[in-house]
């Protein structure tokens, strides 16, 4: 059991591929909390908290989605308000996150996104723009590059890949 700091607003959580770390996106204070998970006891220990927004951003924002890259080396979070995706390197041994990039999502209010099973693509759906945007993921660095590919959709609640 772990109690988030008051006002954080935990929204979603994803385990690392090895199951040793839990990354929680906090909707209200725009942070990601990283916890160590002890499978034997079920215990969670705080390892660190990182902000998903640039330091100079002063507008309204809530974070929405969090995903761990299939390689385990990167974590992604969407910012509704800043209209961006924050990219973090994930240190495998400690689980700690280091900010790498913040990139425009290509629409308003990025609600949900998914990584392809092979980790090559990230597709982002938006709450206030009827659009799916596609990013290529650099396998070595985790950084995103917006592609010219997109699709108009009337409403986007969830993005998922199926085998």
Task: State the predicted function of each range.
Residues 127-133, 145-163:
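Blade-level signature of beta-propeller repeat domains, shared across WD40, Kelch, NHL, RCC1
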Residues 1-53:
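Acidic, glycine-rich loop-and-beta core segments that form the ion-binding/anion-interacting portion
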Residues 4-21, 52-72, 106-121, 153-163:
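Beta-rich, blade/repeat-based domains predominating
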Residues 1-2, 44-52, 96-104, 144-152:
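Beta-propeller fold detector
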Residues 86-136:
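C-terminal hydrophobic structural anchor segments
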Residues 16, 24-27, 77-80, 124-127:
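Conserved beta-strand positions in repeat-built beta-propeller and related beta-rich domains
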Residues 29, 72, 81-84, 129:
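Surface-exposed loop/turn positions within WD40 beta-propeller blades
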């Amino acid at each position: 059991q772990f109690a988030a700091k008051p006002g954080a607003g935990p929204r979603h959580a994803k385990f690392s591929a090895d199951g040793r770390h839990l990354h929680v996106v906090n909707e209200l204070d725009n942070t990601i909390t990283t916890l160590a998970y002890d499978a034997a006891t079920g215990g969670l220990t705080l390892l660190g908290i990182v902000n998903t927004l640039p330091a100079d951003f002063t507008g309204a924002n809530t974070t929405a989605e969090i995903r761990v890259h299939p390689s385990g080396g990167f974590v992604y979070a969407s910012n509704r308000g800043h209209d961006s995706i924050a990219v973090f390197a994930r240190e495998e041994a400690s689980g700690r996150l280091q900010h790498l990039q913040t990139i425009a999502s290509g629409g308003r209010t990025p609600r949900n996104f998914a990584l392809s099973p092979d980790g090559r693509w990230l597709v982002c759906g938006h709450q206030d723009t009827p659009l799916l945007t596609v990013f290529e993921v650099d396998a070595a660095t985790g950084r995103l590059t917006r592609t010219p590919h997109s699709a108009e959709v009337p409403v986007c609640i969830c993005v998922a890949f199926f085998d």
